[in-house]
Every structure is written in structure tokens, then in C-alpha cells.
Amino acid sequence: MKRNIIFVFLLTAAASVFAQSGKKEIIKKGWNFGPLPVVGFNSDLGFQYGACVDIFNYGDGSRYPAYNYKMNVEVSTYTKGSSTFRFYGDYNDIFPKTKLFVDVAYFIDKKFGFYGFNGYCGVFEKDIAVFKNNESFYVDHNSKSAFNYLCRKQIRAVVSVKRPFPSCNRFFYAFGLGYFNNAFDRLDVSGYDDQLSLYELYRDADLIRDDEKYGNVTQLKAGLIFDSRDHENDPCSGTYVEAVVTGAPDLIDGHGYNFMTATAVFSQYYSFLKNHFTFAYRLGAQNVIAGDVPFHAMMNTNILFYKKLTTDALGGSNSLRGINPNGVIGKGYAWLNAELRCRIYDFQFVRQNWIIGLNPFFDAGLVTQTFRADEQKRAWQTLCEKYTVAGVDDYVYSSKDESLHTALGCGLKLIMNHNLVVSVDAAKALDKRDGDELKLYVGFNYIF
């Protein structure tokens, strides 16, 4: 039965593809605007409302679908306080042969996911509420859980540039500057006031130090890039490789957290049936190669040019869809995304070129370099020395080895002029330790 359903789906998709109209694509020139409302609901955070707009300039149209520059503004908030304020600009024509990327953002996330260190070495317990009564812990399985949440506020400012090597328009050298201010605290949502979170247990066990709950990070980046993609935002064929070394000297806080990371991303795109289908995959890895990284800086993937709203890793909409957000964190990690991008139907509306697409996908990742693993093993004993925890399981260390985290899903895309991509992805983890619910993500752009 399942095979028949898959066959009918593929047959329908193929029929839709070849039934597309043969209208000549409109060549865009000058300014182009893509405004969209931001609307959502979360039972804890309330209603989400706001607006987002993509602004393009195509110049005389000779480079279409490439643009001279693109700007994006998003302002959205929930009625209970979580908010996003972001501007980014992608400029290809301000300086000769130079791409300039600017990103400035402020995030208030009052329900930020935290599932512990080192992937499956941490413990995932659904729907538990942990309370502290005087010097004792006790667990209630009937209360709504706040165990895997905390409050995070982040300020981000990034500038990156890339230029081609002489006589070679596929190879680039790149540099970047970054600044991050991260502040973590206990969950700040009404209805959970008396509960203890995993973050607080980590703080009590000193797995997260007192000087790591907030901090500033300055970044100096240098990288090499190879790019043979036919389109930057909606590629059908080509290869993209980015290798970056990021130095983070402690210039502001004086806490002594100086560190360096190495990040590599390799993406390829293979098209067939006249670009109506594209098989795409991305391999990525990041490791700390020198120094001591603090907790507040550990979850950031240090690439030069951003596709998604956040760069948190691993788990969630920008890395491992279907996996608990920030569910796979360590000093080093690796991941894979593989997709079959099906362009089901193309049409023209309000003088814009549109494509409707589907993209079934598979995501996988794991921690390759652990963070305070020995301390994590001893953390529960540290808590037992401070509190009475009789009858309460170890919620810090699972005694399990890390292994591959995997998820399957499918996305729906609405693409305008090969550049503005409205994305809806649904995905589910294949292991219940990564979450047992179907997760839905609404946003912009392919993840790679």
C-alpha cells in the first residue's frame, strides 16, 4: 500500500511538472518587493504577529536571476514577549567584484530549548515537572513541563565580504567580523514559576559556570569558498564549499574564554528532467581547535553567510529538522542534509515568476567533540550532595553513548523569481530521544 501511494505521488508530481506552461520567464529589472505578514500562535507564548519584507534590486536585468543587492527586514513579536528584530543586506554591486553581507538582529526567546550536553549522553524525559521543596527534589508527571526550556536574549551583528581570486570567478577568499551578546536565564513564562529546569540543574552542578550565563563574543573570520551554483537562493546544479577559521578573543568580558573554531560546509546539487528535479545534499562539521569555549558561545555555527534566521546548532529549522532544538550540542559536531527538490508547477502572477515545489528530506547529525563529558557523568552525584533526591532519576547523564540523530520530513516551497523562498517544513525524529512529535517550521529560504 505504501509503495502504491509513493508511486502515485511521483506520477502526479511528474505529470504536474510536464504540464507546466511554456511561457517565457519575465526578466526582472530595477526594484522588486516581497512583503509578507508574520502570523502564528504558541500556547505558552501567545499570538505572534509582525511583518517581513524582501527588497531586491536587479539593475538592468542583465544578471537576472542574480541581483545587485537584496535587503530583508523582519519585525515580529508574541503577545507574551518573545520577539524577533532583524535586518540583513546582501550586496553584490556596491564594490567591484565584492559580495558584502551585513546582518543585525535582536532575539528574545522566552522558551528556548535546552536538552543538555553531548547529544544522547543527556537525558530526554517528556512531560516531567521538577520542583524543589526546601532542600529536596520531587517530580510531578501531571504538570505541564518546563524542564527543557530557558530564556535567551541575543544581540547579533555580522559583516562578511568575499572576493574572487584573480582570473578565477569560482574561487573566493573571504573575511568576516562578528559580535554576539548572549544572556541566559530561567524560563520566563507565566505558569511555570515554581519549576526547576534542566538549565538550573546544570547551573547547580556547575556544568554551566557562573560567568557563562551571559557574555560577549567577538569573532574574526577568514575563509575560502568555491561556488559553481547556477542560482544562489534556488540552485538546480553546482557545488558550494565553504571553509572558515574563526578566532574569538575575549576582548570585552575578561573571563579568559579565548578560542578558535574550524567550520567546513560542502553542498552539491544535481538536476535532472530539465531542472524539474534536483537532488541536493550538504555535509557540515565544526570543531573547537584551540582554547576554551564558554557555554553561551557553544551553540553557534560559525559560517560567513547566513541562509536562515538563526545559526544555532544542532537541532531545529536551520540544521536538523525534526530533532529537538539545540538537542545535539557539543564542542564539535557534524551533520548531513539530503533533499529531493521537486518543482511541481511554475506560473506567473502580478508580473512575478513563481514556482511551487516539494522537497522530501533526510537530516542526520551527531556530536564529534564532547563538552565537559567527565563533569556531566559526575554531576548528579554533585547534586545529591546538595539536595535530597531520593526516588528521583539522574536527569543529567543517561549513561548512553552518543550516536547518529536522524529525522525524516517533507517541505513545501513557494519561490518568487528564484530568490524569495517561502518555506513550510514538517519533520519527525526517528528516535524518541530526539522528540516524539511532528515538528512544523515556517520561514524563509532553503536551509542550504
Regions found by a protein language model. Give the residues of each.
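Sequence/structural signature of outer-membrane beta-barrel proteins
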Residues: 56-60, 74-80, 107-111, 180-184, ...
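C-terminal outer-membrane beta-barrel translocator/porin domains of Gram-negative envelope proteins
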Residues: 220-223, 231-352, 368-370, 394
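Transmembrane beta-barrel domains of outer membrane proteins
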Residues: 54-56, 90-92, 160-164, 223-227, ...
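Transmembrane beta-strands of outer-membrane beta-barrel proteins
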Residues: 33-35, 69-73, 99-104, 171-175, ...
